[in-house]
Regions:
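Catalytic machinery of carbohydrate-active enzymes
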Residues: 1-259
Length: 259
């Protein structure tokens, strides 16, 4: 790196290997403050308040090297033209286009698929639904759901990530867990309804530029230890189904409020 004549290093990751790089580099190394101590206090229940968002933490790194950046004039990518996709011949674009990404990496962050199917059945009466997923097993489950409803389409099989992003850019609303699809939709300026289980937006990981009202949370009085972890990978056994205390009716009501 020194041979390349680099003036400074910006580290937006803040992990062990970049800390090692910081030690070797020794100068003009600007690193993200991930707020680990604050987050630790949050999950231990020492306090319960909104922490700085991850987006703001990224921005702060650039401000430290005198880049005058802010979120006041946010520009999002334009919607992608979907005419090249054969599936669009079956989609009624006169209806609102709602994306649903019903899966997450950890089970304690994943809403019951049976309950989500109730949501789908209700809102598909008036709107078009696109289903997003990744793994092979997810794709099979979503295909079965879509085959039983003419207003529900699965993009989990036969569509690359790039393809899925094209469709995400055209959504009127994305419904997701605390997972990647919600963040991807937010990057296109799409409204995102996030369903939270054992994690919480106070940790700073809510999708970018979203109204706080676009979150459905588990009852904190019933599950006072939430957030049990930052990423949803740790939770008491009795909390693993906490997300399913949210009713389909709550989700349907919130969808109607947003769109």
């Amino acid at each position: 790196m020194k041979q390349l004549g680099i003036d400074a290093v910006i580290d937006l990751h803040g992990v062990l290997r970049t800390n090692f790089l910081k030690f070797l580099w020794g100068r003009n190394f600007y690193q993200i403050d991930k707020g680990r101590n604050e987050k630790e206090k949050l999950i231990k229940g020492k306090y319960f308040k909104q922490l700085k968002t991850t987006h703001q933490r990224y921005l702060d790194v650039f401000k430290n090297i005198n880049y005058n950046l802010n979120f006041s004039k946010t520009v999002f990518p334009k919607k992608t033209n979907l005419s090249g996709y054969a599936i669009t011949n079956k989609i009624d674009f006169n209806k609102k286009l709602i994306g649903i990404a019903p899966f997450a990496k950890h089970k304690a962050k994943t809403y019951s698929l049976e309950k989500m199917k109730e949501v789908m059945e209700s809102i598909s009466k008036e709107h078009t639904i696109l289903l997003f997923g990744g793994e092979e097993n997810e794709g099979k489950q979503l295909k079965i759901i879509s085959e039983g409803n003419e207003n529900i389409f699965s993009l989990a099989e036969g569509f690359t990530l790039s393809d899925q992003l094209d469709f995400i850019s055209n959504l009127d609303l994305m419904i997701s867990m605390d997972s990647a699809n919600g963040h991807l939709a937010a990057m296109y300026g799409v409204k995102v309804l996030t369903i939270w289980g054992v994690t919480h937006p106070y940790a700073g990981f809510a999708p970018f530029n979203q109204n706080s009202k676009y979150s459905i949370l588990v009852d904190k009085n019933r599950y006072p230890k939430i957030p049990t972890s930052i990423y949803g990978n740790k939770s008491p056994e009795e909390y693993k189904q906490a997300i399913n205390s949210i009713t389909p009716e709550e989700i349907i009501k919130k969808i109607k409020e947003i769109i």
